[in-house]
Amino acid sequence: MKQPLKNTKRSNYKRKKRERVIALIPTKTNLTSPDKSLTPLPKEIIDYKNVILLRNGITAEGKIFPRRFTKLNAKQQRYMSKAIKNARMVGLLPFVKKSK
């Protein structure tokens, strides 16, 4: 006589559980200057007439720095970019670097 086959259904199969691997994300470091404080700027300070502050937000070529360099949150970065664009239209900031 033939012996009955063993129960080979998948319902009896137990899968080995893997341990979850958690990625370690490094903290943001201040790339511009290490002594600079990371305090948020109020909306009133970010203004198109505040050229000294706006010059810190653009490169030597006149491009706007991204958030990872300015260390501003999303709302402050939007205010900063709008203020830079307004200052360019008024003529307080250059659009591009002057060529020699």
Curated annotation (Swiss-Prot):
Which terms in the GO cellular component ontology are assigned?
chloroplast; cytosolic small ribosomal subunit
Instruction: Provide a GO biological process annotation.
Output: translation
Q: Mainly localized where? A: plastid
Under Pfam families, the record lists:
Ribosomal_S18
Can the keyword Repressor be found in this entry's annotation? no
Q: Where in the cell is it found?
A: Plastid, Chloroplast
User: Any idea which UniProt keywords this protein has?
Assistant: Chloroplast, Plastid, Ribonucleoprotein, Ribosomal protein, RNA-binding, rRNA-binding
Q: What Gene Ontology molecular function terms does this protein carry?
A: small ribosomal subunit rRNA binding; structural constituent of ribosome
Q: Which InterPro entries match?
A: Ribosomal_bS18, Ribosomal_bS18_sf
| Family of the protein in this entry | Belongs to the bacterial ribosomal protein bS18 family.
Which NCBIfam families does the annotation name? S18
Subunit description: Part of the 30S ribosomal subunit.
HAMAP family per the UniProt record, alphabetical: Ribosomal_bS18 (MF_00270)
Q: What is this protein called?
A: Small ribosomal subunit protein bS18c
**What is the source species?**
Pleurastrum terricola
